[in-house]
């Protein structure tokens, strides 16, 4: 079809005025976050040498009538009566089902240009259409979107995923066919958001299978594609209420697969960004299904090494849940402590930041449920030899809300934190950490000098007791080593000695 048509057209190409004007445009329908789909530069332009009207007159004799009977796809919507516009729309959709190879930019360049112009015509029509789309239009649209968008990424494409490790800064791989794909995505966004689309009819064609394949595309290496998909997914979630439970379940399965199996996925941040808007729309009281999503999906998402890539979006989702139901705060903190990255200092800094955000909104009752294990962990962070971890833990005392919670529960918290502060004062190598430690000690002293002094006395007593035990243990082993040095290497039966040899045993050996 394409060859028969284009063989009658000159091969020379030039810039089309209309295409150039539209290239700088953008999709006016934003997503839940308001981000439009930006158009990049043109793939090319329509062939020159013949006027557009000449091409339209010729194409009716070249394209088979099976496209849509009596409708030639390159005719402008302005040139057909209103009764035929939807038939022309379907004809143009069928024309756009041709997919081209973009690995060679010079291959089929004229055909690519015609498809691009046709996609722009379709976008303009959806923008301006006021009549309800027929079922034939919806079916043809769904088919065209599927043909152009749905594809499987090759294994080597996924192996360079940015979600595979910590701190990776690899350049993303950009989709060579983007100049067509971006227009297909823009058309899909406008089509789903159009008031002309009846959701009751559309749900049959934008079904579970379509949604799953759309979600699979979020593993694309191209950030432009993921951004478009994020916007479209939000629009589908808002348009088709009947699909909402399925979308939540399908996204949960992606998260499960990522956390517990592959540890690799490019679109986790985008999915979480969509769900941030979804969570903010949850009705109160929260359903048990939604709480399970928090405990079994969002909290375990702190486990992967690549959590830094999507931590901002994840923290937003978690805090949205806590704002909806403050009683969830303590269980979230306990979950974070369960996944605490003891051997990963960078993640520890991130976790401390998220903990502080949660403490901003936590109630006193929920704080009291988790404060002991929480501040034991914070005390360990204060003593960390990694200065960034110690610094971030001490920065928590700059938060007025946290100070208020600590002051109300100082009888439990001071005995946990003061020993860590004293340990820092005596042993830490970093001057900035030492300065922050002194500031926190001064704050505790002003908060409750009697309690602070009592904690210091107890710390000193514990240190003296520990030093005494250490001295006795060292002396015991020195005696044991001395006794062993006078014994022959062979000739005597071995004696089983416990961890701490008794005084009688040592006397016998001597």
Curated annotation (Swiss-Prot):
Residues 1-51 are annotated as: Disordered. It is a peripheral membrane protein. Signal peptide: none annotated. One of its GO terms (molecular function) is protein phosphatase regulator activity. SUPFAM superfamilies: ARM repeat. GO terms for biological process: meiotic sister chromatid cohesion; positive regulation of response to salt stress; signal transduction. InterPro entries: ARM-like, ARM-type_fold, PP2A_B56. Phosphorylated at Thr-476, Thr-493, Ser-502 and Thr-508 by SIT1. Disruption phenotype: No visible phenotype under normal growth conditions, but mutant plants exhibit increased sensitivity to salt stress. Expressed in root stele and epidermal cells. The modification Phosphothreonine is found at residues 476, 493, 508. Keywords: Cell membrane, Cytoplasm, Membrane, Phosphoprotein, Stress response. GO terms for cellular component: cytosol; plasma membrane; protein phosphatase type 2A complex. Residues 25-51 have a biased composition (Polar residues). It is found in: Cytoplasm, Cytosol; Cell membrane. B regulatory subunit of phosphatase 2A (PP2A) involved in salt stress response. Under salt stress conditions, required for the catalytic activity of PP2A and the dephosphorylation of SIT1, a negative regulator of salt tolerance. Dephosphorylation of SIT1 turns off salt-induced SIT1 activity directly, which has a positive effect on salt tolerance. PANTHER family: SERINE/THREONINE PROTEIN PHOSPHATASE 2A PP2A REGULATORY SUBUNIT B, SERINE_THREONINE PROTEIN PHOSPHATASE 2A 57 KDA REGULATORY SUBUNIT B' KAPPA ISOFORM. PP2A consists of a common heteromeric enzyme, composed of a catalytic subunit (subunits C), a constant regulatory subunit (subunit A), and a variety of regulatory subunits such as subunits B (the R2/B/PR55/B55, R3/B''/PR72/PR130/PR59 and R5/B'/B56 families). Interacts with SIT1. Belongs to the phosphatase 2A regulatory subunit B56 family. This is Serine/threonine protein phosphatase 2A 57 kDa regulatory subunit B' kappa isoform. It comes from Oryza sativa subsp. japonica (Rice).
């Amino acid at each position: 079809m394409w060859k028969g048509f284009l063989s009658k057209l000159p091969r020379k190409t030039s810039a089309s005025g209309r295409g150039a004007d539209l290239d700088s445009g953008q999709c006016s329908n934003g997503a839940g976050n308001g981000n439009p789909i930006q158009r990049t530069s043109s793939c090319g332009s329509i062939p020159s040498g013949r006027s557009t009207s000449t091409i339209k007159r010729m194409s009716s004799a070249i394209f088979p009538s099976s496209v849509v009977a009596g409708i030639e796809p390159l005719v402008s919507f302005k040139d057909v009566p209103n009764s035929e516009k939807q038939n022309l729309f379907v004809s143009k959709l069928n024309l756009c089902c041709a997919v081209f190879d973009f690995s060679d930019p010079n291959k089929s360049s004229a055909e690519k240009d015609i498809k691009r112009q046709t996609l722009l015509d379709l976008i303009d029509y959806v923008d301006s259409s006021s009549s309800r789309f027929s079922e034939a239009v919806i079916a043809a649209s769904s088919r065209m979107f599927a043909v152009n968008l749905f594809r499987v990424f090759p294994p080597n494409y996924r192996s360079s995923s940015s979600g595979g490790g910590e701190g990776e800064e690899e350049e993303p791989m950009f989709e060579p066919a983007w100049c067509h794909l971006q227009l297909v995505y823009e058309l899909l966004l406008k089509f789903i958001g159009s008031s002309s689309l009846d959701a009751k009819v559309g749900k049959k064609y934008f079904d579970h299978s379509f949604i799953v394949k759309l979600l699979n595309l979020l593993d694309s290496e191209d950030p432009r594609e993921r951004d478009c998909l994020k916007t479209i997914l939000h629009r589908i979630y808002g348009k088709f209420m009947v699909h909402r439970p399925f979308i939540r379940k399908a996204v949960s399965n992606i998260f499960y697969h990522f956390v517990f199996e592959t540890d690799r996925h490019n679109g986790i941040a985008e999915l979480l960004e969509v769900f941030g808007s979804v969570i903010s729309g949850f009705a109160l009281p929260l359903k048990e299904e939604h709480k399970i999503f928090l405990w079994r999906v969002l909290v375990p998402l702190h486990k992967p090494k690549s959590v830094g890539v999507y931590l901002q979006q994840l923290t937003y989702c978690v805090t949205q849940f806590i704002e909806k139901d403050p009683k969830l705060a303590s269980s979230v903190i306990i979950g974070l402590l369960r996944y605490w990255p003891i051997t990963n200092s960078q993640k520890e800094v991130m976790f401390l930041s998220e903990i502080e955000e949660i403490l901003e909104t936590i109630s006193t009752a929920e704080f009291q449920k988790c404060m002991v294990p929480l501040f034991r962990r914070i005390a360990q962070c204060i003593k960390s030899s990694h200065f960034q971890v110690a610094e971030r833990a001490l920065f928590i005392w700059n938060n007025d809300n946290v100070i208020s919670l600590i002051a109300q529960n100082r009888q439990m918290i001071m005995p946990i934190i003061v020993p860590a502060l004293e340990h820092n004062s005596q042993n830490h190598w970093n001057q900035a950490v030492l300065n922050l430690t002194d500031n926190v000690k001064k704050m505790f002293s002003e908060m409750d000098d009697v309690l602070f002094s009592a904690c210091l006395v107890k710390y000193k007593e514990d240190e003296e007791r520990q030093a005494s035990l250490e001295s006795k243990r060292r002396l015991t082993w020195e005696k044991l080593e001395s006794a062993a040095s006078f014994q022959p290497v062979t000739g005597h039966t071995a004696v089983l000695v416990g961890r701490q040899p008794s005084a009688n045993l040592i006397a016998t050996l001597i």
